[in-house]
Amino acid sequence: MLERQRPLTPPIAETSSYPVQIPEAQRSLFRQVLALFEQKKVSYAVAGALALQEHTGIHRDTKDLDAFLTPENAALALRYLRQEGFDCEVCDPVWLYKAHRGVFYVDLITGMSNAVIVVEDSWISRAQPAVVHGTPTRVLAAEELLVSKLFVTRHERFDGADIAHMVYAVGNRLDWPRVFELVGEHWELLLWALIFFRYVYPGETHCVPTEVWQSLIVRFQDVIGRADPHTRFRGSLIDDKMFAVDVKDWGKENLLLEYRLRRLKTIPDVR
C-alpha cells in the first residue's frame, strides 16, 4: 500500500534586501487606496511588510496593504472603500476589516486579535513620513510597529524575526520609554523578544541600551522572587489553539475571551 503523502505547505518567501517586483495592478490599487484616504482625510498609518521595509530595508513579497487605524477611522475608511466599489468585509470586529479587488486587498487593522493592544490616536500621530509605491504617506513609527508584533506568536505565524531585524536596524534609536509605555503589564513578552534577539545577534547586544536590559532583568528577578501561584494563566493570549487544552480540559482561565468581550463593548458599529 502506498503511503499517503501529506499535502505540501505553501513555500515561505525569503527575506531580501533587494526590491521585490510588484505587479502594476497591485501598485495601482494600493496607490488608489492611499490617495482615497488622503482625499477623505482618514487618519491612518501604513504597517506590515511595507513599514518593516521602511525601517529595516527588508523587502518581502506581499499581496496586501496593511493600514492601522483607530476603530472609528476604520469604520470611515470601510465606508469610503465601499463607495469606491471595493468588496468589503468585517473579518473580526475586534481588530480586522478587509477591502479587496481580485487577488489584492487592503487590511484595516485596529489592534491585535487578542484585544490586548489597541490602535490609538497616538499611534497615528507618531507615524513618520514615507513614500510607498510612489505615493507620499506615513508608516508606523518603529516603536509601535515593534510592539504590534509582540503577540504574533501563534503556531502558524511568528514575527520574532521581524522584531529581531527591527532591533538590529533601529534599536539604538528607539524611544524605549515609549515601548515600555505600550507594552505595559505585558513587559515579559518584550523581554522574551529581546532575549530572542540576543540569541540571534549575540554580537549586537549593544543595539539594546544597557539600562533597558537591566530594567527588564531586575523586574524579572523581582517577580520570580515573589512568584504568586494565583497569578492568572495567560496562554490563550499567545495562542488560543495551542493552549486550548489548558482552558478546556485543565480549567485554566480564558483571558482571551475576557479581553475580547471587553473590547467588543467599545467598538463602533460598522455597516
Please provide the spans of the model-predicted regions.
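Compositionally biased terminal segments of proteins
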Residues: 1-271
